[in-house]
Every structure is written in structure tokens, then in C-alpha cells.
């Protein structure tokens, strides 16, 4: 059956259009939904959004109460990342709510949340789901010793020292930063949640309370328990960051000079907000600190292929390739604290892996115990995704032909056995050939 040439000519433009559409879809970066209180935030925080676009992110701006909002459709996530820059929202629009966002996190999505003193209930509930408790509405972090010279008198324009940052270059960046400018609501971490990260804390003189009221009760957060920026990496490697300040990401704070109001304090021409905001966004959106397992191999020393079963006390070699995502490309990971465990129920062997070229390997002797074992690498470090690799193998006992014919430690027993045999042989000869003398009359 032949195709009409006219149909073929018409089909070529359609094929070209389809290929162009597929090319655009494949070339698009991570899909990111940005929820705003109003679209003016897009202009007041343009530097931050521009940094995301320059890194290839596809941003979709919508107001938080837009009735067409949707994160999930037909069981599939419509976006890879979610940015909530709408602290005062009381009800999300469309089918987005706290439960939907929690499901998005459970599905591995990344979320960046910025609050303020005008925080609404939805963000407070979302924080509680992630082990973060925000202070009451209209409260602010106050520090009478570490406030900026441009503060209006309530001491809520905080100058946070970089010494209060989490010691994790993967999260906060590797370069030294100028002091951080902060104005917003304080947070407290759930002490029972080990996954919460105290990224930026207040100083020992900071506290969270109503700035226009006298203190009549103990503040919600005091001293270094006051969190300015907090993070979370879930067990499924989903990442969330909570900032108590929406102004932290603003152009005004990025370009502002900073100087503490204390006499003799150093003046900086620019804050460290921009560098920190970029570093945090790179981490939360999984541009940094992402690891993956490459090919894994194991075999007896001197061989190349793994056997069907190992034998106890075999000398084996284990190798694994671990890669890290860097600037959109997978490169070999450089770490000196990666351990291998040889586990049955409990580890029988635990040893460090040594890097050789682009892979990590180690040689060790199997224990004199047979059963079903696992080569296990369980690498969990601050700022990195959880890396786990498990390979199951069987270890059998020695065959009867593989045992030593004589065991040196048993030589005394061998000697006693052979001496007993020789003595019995001599005794038998003597006994059989001995003849009693006949008695004479």
C-alpha cells in the first residue's frame, strides 16, 4: 500500500512541529511553582528569581489564592519544586492545602517557604508537619545588642553573624559571607525530630515576642534556640527550607549595607543575604549534595567475576562507584569517611573504603562464619542525600576436601593416638606369643 505523496508533504511540517515541541519539553529545566501574596513580590524579589532562571529553572508565578492552583493531576506531580512566598495566606486556592503539600514532600518534592510576622495558619500547620513551630502572628525576633543602624527603634532588623550558621558548606556555601540581615518571625525546632537542621540561629541575646508590647510572659524562643532559618531533609531525601523572613530574599536586603548599632562596629557595603540565599536554593532544589551509587563489584582476590558462593575465610575485594551531582553533571565523589559493612544480622566486618581512581574499594578476609551476608554501604552525612547500597551473597563452609589433612595444633593428640596403637600392637604380639612354662612332676 502506497501513501499519497500529498499526504506525505503535509505530514512533514507536522512532524517538524512535534519534534520542536518535544525538544522544548526536554530542554526545560526543573518545573517550579511560585506562590505569592501578590504579584508585586516578583518585582521586589527579582534578583532571587533571576538567579533561579539563570540556572535553568522554569518558574510559574501565581497568587496563593488562585482558584486554578494544582500540584497533582491524575496522580502525577505537575511541578518538581514549590516556593511559597506568601506568608499571610489564610487559604490556598485550587486543590492545594497543607495535606497536598505534605504529600508533595512525601513524594520527594522540594519546598522553600518564607514567612514573616504576618504569618497565616497554613504555613504554621505546614511547619508543624515538618517539625518546625512558628511563633504567634505579629511577633518578631528582637535583639537589643545585634540590630542594624537603620533599625527604626524596635530592634527587629537583626544582624546575624555568620558564626551562627550551620557548619555545613554543602548547605550554606563554601565562601565566607558578610553578616546576614533578617527581619521576621522566630521559629523553634521540635526536639524529638532529628531531621530538622538549625541552619541559622539567633544570638544568645535574641528572643521572639511582640515588638510593641511589654514582656509579660516567657518568650516562645530565647537565645540560640531561636531559629531564623531551618531546614529538613526527609528520609526519602526530600528537602524543605523554612525562613522566618520573606525580606531575607528581597532585593532591598540583597543590596543593603549592614552595620551593627554597637559603637565601633564594622560597616559592610553589602549583606551576605544573596550568597546565602543562592546556596540555600541550590541545596533545597537538589543542585548540591546529591549522591548516587554507580556500578558495584565484588570477587575473590585474583579473580574477576563474583562466584556463586564464597567460602569462609576467602580474601575478597569489594568496589563501588559513588558520584556527586555538580553543575548538572555527575562527577566522582571525594570522601574519606565511607565505610563498608559485611553483615549477617550484625556486622562481622566494618572497614573504610579507599578511593582508587574513580571508585572506592577494599580487600578483606571473610569471617569464619557461614550464612547469608550483605555487602552494605550506608552513608548518611550532613547536607548530602542518604546513600545506601546492599548486595547479598552466600558464604558456605569448607568442603571436606578443603580442610587441612593434619592440624598442627592437634599433633599431641595424633602422637597419643599413634602411641596407643603402637602399644596395643606390641602388647598383642607379646600376649599371643607368650607361653607359660609347664609344671614338672
UniProtKB/Swiss-Prot annotation:
Residues 1-28 form the signal peptide. Residues 29-412 are lumenal. It comes from the Eukaryota. One of its GO terms (biological process) is protein N-linked glycosylation via asparagine. It is a single-pass type I membrane protein. The chain crosses the membrane at residues 413-432. It is found in: Endoplasmic reticulum membrane. Keywords: Endoplasmic reticulum, Membrane, Signal, Transmembrane, Transmembrane helix. InterPro entries: DDOST_48_kDa_subunit (IPR005013), OST48_MD (IPR055459), OST48_N (IPR055457). Pathway: Protein modification; protein glycosylation. It holds the Pfam family OST48_N. Residues 433-441 are cytoplasmic. Subunit of the oligosaccharyl transferase (OST) complex that catalyzes the initial transfer of a defined glycan (Glc(3)Man(9)GlcNAc(2) in eukaryotes) from the lipid carrier dolichol-pyrophosphate to an asparagine residue within an Asn-X-Ser/Thr consensus motif in nascent polypeptide chains, the first step in protein N-glycosylation. N-glycosylation occurs cotranslationally and the complex associates with the Sec61 complex at the channel-forming translocon complex that mediates protein translocation across the endoplasmic reticulum (ER). All subunits are required for a maximal enzyme activity. PANTHER family: DOLICHYL-DIPHOSPHOOLIGOSACCHARIDE--PROTEIN GLYCOSYLTRANSFERASE 48 KDA SUBUNIT. Component of the oligosaccharyltransferase (OST) complex. OST exists in two different complex forms which contain common core subunits RPN1, RPN2, OST48, OST4, DAD1 and TMEM258, either STT3A or STT3B as catalytic subunits, and form-specific accessory subunits. STT3A complex assembly occurs through the formation of 3 subcomplexes. Subcomplex 1 contains RPN1 and TMEM258, subcomplex 2 contains the STT3A-specific subunits STT3A, DC2/OSTC, and KCP2 as well as the core subunit OST4, and subcomplex 3 contains RPN2, DAD1, and OST48. This is Dolichyl-diphosphooligosaccharide--protein glycosyltransferase 48 kDa subunit. It comes from Mus musculus. The gene is Ddost.
Amino acid at each position: 500500500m502506497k501513501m499519497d505523496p500529498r499526504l506525505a508533504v503535509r505530514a512533514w511540517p507536522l512532524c517538524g512541529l512535534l519534534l520542536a515541541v518535544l525538544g522544548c519539553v526536554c530542554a526545560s529545566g526543573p518545573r517550579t511553582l511560585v506562590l505569592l501574596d501578590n504579584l508585586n513580590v516578583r518585582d521586589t524579589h527579582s534578583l532571587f528569581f533571576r538567579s533561579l532562571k539563570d540556572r535553568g529553572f522554569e518558574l510559574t508565578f501565581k497568587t496563593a489564592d488562585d482558584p486554578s492552583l494544582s500540584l497533582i493531576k491524575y496522580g502525577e506531580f505537575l511541578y518538581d519544586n514549590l516556593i511559597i512566598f506568601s506568608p499571610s495566606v489564610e487559604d490556598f486556592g485550587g486543590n492545594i492545602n497543607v495535606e497536598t503539600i505534605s504529600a508533595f514532600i512525601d513524594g520527594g518534592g522540594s519546598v522553600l517557604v518564607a514567612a514573616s510576622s504576618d504569618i497565616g495558619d497554613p504555613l504554621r500547620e505546614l511547619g508543624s508537619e515538618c517539625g518546625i513551630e512558628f511563633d504567634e502572628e505579629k511577633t518578631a525576633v528582637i535583639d537589643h545588642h545585634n540590630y542594624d543602624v537603620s533599625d527604626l527603634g524596635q530592634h527587629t532588623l537583626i544582624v546575624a553573624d555568620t558564626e551562627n550558621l550551620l557548619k555545613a558548606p554543602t548547605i550554606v556555601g563554601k565562601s565566607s559571607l558578610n553578616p546576614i540581615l533578617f527581619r521576621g518571625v522566630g521559629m523553634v525546632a521540635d526536639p524529638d525530630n532529628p531531621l530538622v537542621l538549625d541552619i541559622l540561629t539567633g544570638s544568645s541575646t535574641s528572643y521572639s515576642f511582640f515588638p510593641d508590647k511589654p514582656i509579660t510572659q516567657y518568650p516562645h524562643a530565647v537565645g540560640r534556640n531561636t531559629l531564623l532559618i531551618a531546614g529538613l531533609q526527609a528520609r526519602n531525601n526530600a528537602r524543605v527550607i523554612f525562613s522566618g523572613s520573606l525580606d531575607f530574599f528581597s532585593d532591598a536586603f540583597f543590596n543593603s549595607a549592614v552595620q551593627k548599632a554597637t559603637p565601633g562596629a564594622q560597616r559592610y557595603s553589602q549583606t551576605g543575604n544573596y550568597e546565602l540565599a543562592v546556596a540555600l536554593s541550590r541545596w533545597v532544589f537538589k543542585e548540591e549534595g546529591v549522591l548516587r551509587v554507580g556500578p558495584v563489584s565484588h570477587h575473590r582476590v585474583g579473580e574477576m567475576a563474583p562466584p556463586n558462593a564464597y567460602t569462609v575465610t576467602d580474601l575478597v575485594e569489594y568496589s563501588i562507584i559513588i558520584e556527586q551531582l555538580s553543575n548538572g553533571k555527575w562527577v566522582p565523589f571525594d570522601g574519606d569517611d565511607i565505610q563498608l559493612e559485611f553483615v549477617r544480622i550484625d556486622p562481622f566486618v566494618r572497614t573504610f573504603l579507599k578511593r582508587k581512581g574513580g571508585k572506592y574499594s577494599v580487600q578483606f578476609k571473610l569471617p569464619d562464619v557461614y550464612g547469608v551476608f550483605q555487602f552494605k554501604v550506608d552513608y548518611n552525612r550532613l547536607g548530602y542525600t542518604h546513600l545506601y547500597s546492599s548486595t547479598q551473597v552466600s558464604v558456605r563452609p569448607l568442603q571436606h576436601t578443603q580442610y587441612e589433612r593434619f592440624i598442627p595444633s592437634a599433633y599431641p593428640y595424633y602422637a597419643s593416638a599413634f602411641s596407643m596403637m603402637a602399644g596395643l600392637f606390641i602388647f598383642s604380639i607379646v600376649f599371643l606369643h607368650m607361653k607359660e612354662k609347664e609344671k614338672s612332676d
